[in-house]
Design a protein with these regions (language model features):
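Helical "substrate-binding/catalytic lid" subdomain
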Residues: 73-120
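Rossmann-fold dinucleotide-binding core
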Residues: 3-82
């Protein structure tokens, strides 16, 4: 349940299969608040049999969990999520820089902008 390399996840999954074990890669989104409140989003990769076995654990930790594909797919999904988050953060930074350059108080702009409030 960590964010790591999709290649490493596939290697761990293959080794688990050799040993007769089940394995998933299952990175999460939601941070420490999501973990504390059992509201994590869990992005899993691996066999459906392993996913079904892990669902009671996921239900105790999260609000949403999806099997994304084979081993490594959870890691790839987490990376895609991080790209989306980073681009939103960059957009907010650009908007505030623009506001400042236009002579506005950048602390006031998010209060009047629904898009900035959602992203912040």
């Amino acid at each position: 349940m960590t964010t790591s390399s999709p290649l490493l996840a596939a290697k761990i999954g293959a080794r688990a299969r050799e040993l007769g074990c089940e394995a998933l890669d299952a990175p999460v989104s939601g941070g420490d608040v999501g973990a504390r409140d059992a509201k994590l989003t869990i992005m899993a990769g691996g066999p459906e049999t392993a996913f079904k076995l892990a669902e009671p654990l996921f239900a105790a930790m999260g609000k949403e969990w999806k099997l994304q594909g084979p081993w490594g797919a959870g890691q790839h999904t987490k990376m895609a999520n991080q790209i989306a988050i980073a681009s939103n953060m960059m957009g907010v930074c650009e908007a505030l820089a623009y506001a400042r350059a236009a002579g506005l108080d950048p602390r006031r702009v998010p209060k009047a902008s629904p898009a900035a409030r959602r992203a912040a």
